[in-house]
């Protein structure tokens, strides 16, 4: 066999070995993925993380492996905790979901996961930004619209508490009409854009999901903050509070209807809180 023939024979042999190793790695990766899923379902998140990491190393193109890894990491993120260790885990999970988006730019679920992680570590700017990315892909997503409305309410409410507490005033939840102008007028200017946006997105959420009782409850809350923005306009304040009361009542009725539907058994049988069938 001449040199050229030997070269091609060796090349074919090596190619076969590489293909064989690649196929073996794919099988091993799927095995690690399955083990990770089992650990995740059992609540063993650290073990699941190890399996999902091995799966992605063995087969970087394995569908869902990185998504599952991001979800497992997310379980270790403590909501509301901003310690360096917790933020490190949160950012690891976020980076994994961003890697998924690099391969699938319109993966709305990864966008939602990123937004949710940012929300859980109180990074509201990024949480809102990513929820708006969700709405760019799916304009009718009620949860994204709801979350943006909640963020706007949280900001406006905190602004109000800061202003009132600095003046030694307790929030009355009814527009604080007795508070002085030098407190309420600057607050109204500060909060007006937040209230407008919050109302817009919470209304979108309810329109897209008519039984969204949580969004209805936040409409109640944001109308109460709108009463502060309408300081000095008695008719507007009265209307804001009436709207708040209406949304409270609607939220309660809708929640009851949702619970009744949840407890409804086959054939229209309803199970009450005591377990009795009707």
Annotate each predicted stretch with a short phrase.
Residues 60, 105, 139-140, 210, ...:
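Short coil turns that delineate tetratricopeptide repeat
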Residues 30-54, 58, 79-83, 184:
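Alpha-helical segment of the N-proximal tetratricopeptide repeat
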Residues 29, 46, 74-99, 151-204, ...:
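Short coil/linker segments at helix-helix boundaries
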Residues 20-23:
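C-terminal motif of bacterial Sec signal peptides marking the signal peptidase cleavage site
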Residues 25-27:
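Bacterial signal peptide processing site
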Residues 56-57, 95-102, 133-136, 204-207, ...:
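Conserved structural position within tetratricopeptide repeats
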């Amino acid at each position: 066999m001449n040199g050229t023939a030997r070269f091609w024979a060796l090349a074919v042999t090596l190619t076969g070995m590489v293909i064989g190793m690649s196929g073996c790695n794919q099988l091993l990766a799927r095995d690690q993925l399955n083990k990770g899923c089992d650990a995740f379902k059992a609540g063993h998140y650290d073990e699941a993380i190890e399996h999902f990491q091995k799966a992605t190393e063995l087969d970087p193109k394995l569908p869902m492996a990185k998504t599952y890894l991001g979800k497992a990491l997310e379980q270790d993120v403590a909501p509301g905790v901003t310690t360096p260790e917790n933020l490190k885990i949160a950012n690891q999970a976020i980076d994994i979901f961003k890697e998924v988006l690099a391969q699938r730019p319109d993966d709305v679920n990864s966008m939602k996961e990123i937004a949710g992680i940012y929300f859980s570590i109180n990074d509201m700017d990024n949480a809102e930004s990513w929820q708006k990315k969700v709405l760019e892909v799916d304009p009718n997503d009620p949860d994204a619209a709801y979350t943006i409305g909640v963020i706007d309410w949280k900001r406006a409410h905190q602004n109000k508490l800061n202003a009132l507490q600095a003046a030694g005033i307790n929030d009355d939840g009814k527009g604080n009409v007795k508070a002085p102008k030098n407190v309420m007028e600057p607050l109204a200017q500060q909060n007006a854009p937040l209230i407008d946006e919050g109302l817009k997105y919470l209304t979108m959420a309810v329109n897209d999901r008519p039984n969204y009782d949580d969004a209805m409850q936040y409409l109640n809350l944001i109308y109460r903050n709108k009463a502060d923005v309408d300081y000095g306009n008695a008719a507007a304040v009265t209307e804001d509070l009436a709207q708040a009361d209406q949304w409270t009542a609607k939220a309660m009725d809708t929640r009851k209807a949702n619970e009744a539907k949840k407890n409804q058994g086959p054939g229209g049988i309803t199970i009450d809180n005591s377990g009795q069938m009707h």
